[in-house]
Regions:
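Contiguous segments within soluble domain cores/interaction surfaces
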Residues: 11-137, 141-146, 150-163
Length: 163
């Protein structure tokens, strides 16, 4: 009896923490391949070292974004915002088109319910900045405004002067 109670408490804790989340991949190029594959060329692992003095222009920088939401919380709207180091206002603001809420719910309802894994709705997009002007080192941040009221942090890339 006690063990069932503990399992229920743990399950409720896990279920309450399953919320929307996302991530970004920063790279030099994104290529569409045969079979619907994407290739990420020159991926950065949290930092990009710049050998030229600031300000400077990068020929291209790409960001691929994934946003996941529990199936019980379909998206109404998604607005992706990118911020350059030191800026409070986004230099890029891109909406991601989302299907109607009922279409998202119907799609999830048609999935096999016995997978054992939680079901998520996934939104993804690729942003290509060519060229990209950088005034100073610091953090390039990626955020998403979900349903016009929830800001989701999707990652950042530290831009540093190489020594």
């Amino acid at each position: 009896m006690q063990s069932g109670s503990a399992n229920r408490i743990i399950w409720n804790l896990v279920a309450s923490r399953m919320d929307r989340y996302g991530y970004s991949i920063f790279c030099d190029d994104i290529r569409n391949e045969a079979g619907g594959k994407l290739s990420f060329i020159g991926c950065y692992n949290g930092v990009i070292f710049i050998s030229e003095p600031f300000p400077l222009v990068l020929p291209k920088l790409c960001v691929h974004i994934h946003i996941l939401s529990p199936a019980s919380r379909p998206f109404s709207s998604i607005d992706v915002r990118c911020y350059l180091p030191g800026d409070d206002k986004p230099f890029s603001e891109e909406p991601i088109e989302t299907p109607e809420r009922h279409d998202q719910t119907e799609l999830v309802a048609n999935l096999k319910p016995d997978t054992g894994a939680p079901l998520f709705i996934v939104a993804a997009t690729s942003l290509i900045f060519a060229p990209l002007k950088l005034r100073s080192p610091g953090l390039m941040r990626v955020r998403a405004l979900i349903d016009a009221d929830q800001e989701l942090r999707l990652g950042s890339l530290r831009i540093e002067q190489a020594s």
